[in-house]
C-alpha cells in the first residue's frame, strides 16, 4: 500500500527510526541499525519514488547505508507529542532547521574505535581511545563518516565577495 501511494505522489515523507525497546535508558544496543522492515521499506519506496525526505526519530546514532535514497534527512531526536507540528513547521519553511548534530553519524559500527572490545565483560565502561572519543577519533584517524559532529543545514546560502584584509 505504501509503495503504491509513493508511486502516485510528488514526494514521499518517510518517518522512521528506533522503537521504545531500542531507545531505553540503562542498556546498550547490540547494533546501530534501524529495524530491518524499515530498511526494506526504504528500498522499496526508493524504487517507486526517488523524491524522498526522511524524518528520523532516534535518540542516538544509527547506521545509514541507505541514506543516499533520500533527497533530505531531518533528524528529530525523540520528538514527543508536539513533534509532528515541529516537523511541519520545518518542512513548510515556517522555521529554520538550524540544529546541528551532537554526534558523528558513522558509516558502520565497525569503524568505531571501541568495536573490538565492546561489549565488555567489565562493570565499567572502557574508553581505550583516551582523548580521541567521538568526533576527535574520526577527525584524527581520517575515518570517513556519513555526517560529522556539528553537521547541519539551514534554508539559506552565503556568498562572500570583495573581501579586504588590512595588515597590522
Language-model features: locations:
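Secreted, periplasmic, or luminal enzymes acting at the cell surface/secretory milieu
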Residues: 57-168
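Hydrophobic helix-and-loop "lid/oligomerization" segment in the mid-to-C-terminal part
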Residues: 1-69
Amino acid at each position: 500500500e505504501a509503495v503504491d501511494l509513493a508511486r502516485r505522489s510528488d514526494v514521499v515523507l518517510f518517518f522512521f527510526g528506533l522503537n521504545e525497546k531500542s531507545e531505553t535508558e540503562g542498556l546498550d544496543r547490540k547494533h546501530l541499525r534501524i529495524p530491518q522492515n524499515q530498511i526494506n521499506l526504504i528500498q522499496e519506496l526508493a524504487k517507486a519514488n526517488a523524491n524522498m525526505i526522511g524524518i528520523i526519530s532516534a535518540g542516538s546514532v544509527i547506521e545509514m547505508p541507505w541514506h543516499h535514497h533520500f533527497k533530505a534527512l531531518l533528524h528529530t531526536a525523540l520528538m514527543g507529542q508536539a513533534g509532528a507540528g515541529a516537523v511541519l513547521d520545518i518542512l513548510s519553511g515556517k522555521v529554520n532547521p538550524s540544529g546541528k548534530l551532537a554526534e558523528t553519524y558513522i558509516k558502520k559500527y565497525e569503524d568505531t574505535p571501541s568495536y573490538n572490545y565492546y561489549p565488555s565483560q567489565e562493570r565499567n565502561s572502557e574508553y581505550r581511545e583516551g582523548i580521541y572519543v567521538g568526533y576527535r577519533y574520526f577527525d584524527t584517524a581520517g575515518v570517513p563518516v556519513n555526517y560529522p559532529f556539528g553537521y547541519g543545514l539551514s534554508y539559506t546560502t552565503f556568498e562572500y565577495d570583495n573581501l579586504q584584509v588590512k595588515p597590522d
